[in-house]
């Protein structure tokens, strides 16, 4: 009986250890899933992998005589009742020239709705040379019923584009945005205002 009792205790301890290990693994996988999205986004923005454009803080200082056509595409994921489209379907720009175009979003629903856009470039290799100075990607946007919103994009094509042998026959680049529905953004607390209230002014 004693041996049997000891075996049962060992079995229970073993089961408990396995349960804790499985739970820890599950929690780690959930954390990795949430972390993978921003990490993948950063990786793509740095490398241009998968047609992801580059994000820069300054304009190009070199403008070439060669031109390229840039087309603009707009998509809406299921569950977001918006009309979303580029205000210009395409432009022809000089390589290195900074250009601004605009998209427009309209809430078709009778309630306030919320969306966030992701983006891509085709052909994929061109993403490494498509530089955005200003864009609305990965920003939470709120639209009231019937509200319209203009969404500017400022970009240029890196002059190094012409030196890439894999892109020598590319005459057109397509910039594509897709809006996805998101939950209502949480309000941001104004720390200064809170501090002023506590101090009586």
Swiss-Prot record:
Organism: Brucella canis (strain ATCC 23365 / NCTC 10854 / RM-666)
Keywords noted in UniProt: Cell inner membrane, Cell membrane, Copper, Membrane, Signal-anchor, Transmembrane, Transmembrane helix
One Pfam family matching this protein: CtaG_Cox11
Keyword Transcription: no
Molecular functions (GO terms): copper ion binding
Name used for this protein in its record: Cytochrome c oxidase assembly protein CtaG
Transmembrane segments: 14-36
Coiled coil: none
Recorded family membership: Belongs to the COX11/CtaG family.
Periplasmic side: 37-201
Listed GO biological process terms: respiratory chain complex IV assembly
Cellular component aspect of the GO annotation: plasma membrane
Cytoplasmic compartment segments: 1-13
PANTHER family: CYTOCHROME C OXIDASE ASSEMBLY PROTEIN COX11, MITOCHONDRIAL-RELATED, CYTOCHROME C OXIDASE ASSEMBLY PROTEIN COX11-RELATED
